[in-house]
């Protein structure tokens, strides 16, 4: 293994190698080792990249760690992957130690799928679970008809003229959330640029014309939205990508209505394809959001996997 080296920029070839590394790990483990945001960051200079290369003439990537900076009260976050053929050589441990040294022990680590090797590495280094993100799934068969309350308008995304209201509702609904809160126009633009983006899969719930005088430019006010996603690399899999309801509009059943509208749309769009297997939908929810977990269970979802964030319990003592 070569020396661990931090980079603020990856070449096109290094980005390709990291993507190949992620693909190799996913095929063996059955779960992606890093989130989609990490893949978006490969071409950017907003995060730090730790690349471990083998000693072959081509210097192929056998280990990678992405470190996103801290934002306000939210800790810096690391996500890492080691090539299946290069495991049990101390590469993951070396990368974790390098990240802890860089942040003074104050960053967290995502372990997607909470696999046994990740648990063992965390335990050996004194890392403890601080957050759990539950992935839930259900079949897209036998979906009930959504009940649309009186005075509610449902339409799909019309373009950038909807962005201001989308950001307002998103940032109000997820004010507490490390990844989903605080979005800007740039965040929306990045996702519109993704190959999977389909405006017909972004549903908006707006109040009737009687509330229009209270909204910008006299247009109906956005109460909530459901952004769906079809996974292009996993035929037959859809996702509740973002489901947000304005806190001022909660208690009206909008979340359930929007969920079912989006699921029926996913079922129709995926049903148009010759998949050879049953279509499925997934979503992520914080494990401590008991109300949301129970709501999704009531809609037929069950736990598929759990992602765990680890951190040092006492950074100063551990690194002293």
Swiss-Prot record:
Record-listed E.C. numbers: 2.3.1.189
List of residues binding acetyl-CoA 1: 80-82, 88-93
Binding-site list for 1D-myo-inositol 2-(L-cysteinylamino)-2-deoxy-alpha-D-glucopyranoside: 36, 179, 229, 239, 284
GO annotation, biological process: mycothiol biosynthetic process
Matches recorded under Pfam families: Acetyltransf_1
PROSITE patterns in the record: GNAT
Top class in the EC scheme: transferase
Catalytic activity: 1D-myo-inositol 2-(L-cysteinylamino)-2-deoxy-alpha-D-glucopyranoside + acetyl-CoA = mycothiol + CoA + H(+)
Residue numbers binding acetyl-CoA 2: 243-245, 250-256, 289-294
Domain annotation N-acetyltransferase: ranges: 16-141, 152-320
GO molecular function ontology, one term from the record: protein-N-terminal-alanine acetyltransferase activity
Known partners and oligomeric status: Monomer.
Protein name: Mycothiol acetyltransferase
Organism: Mycobacterium marinum (strain ATCC BAA-535 / M)
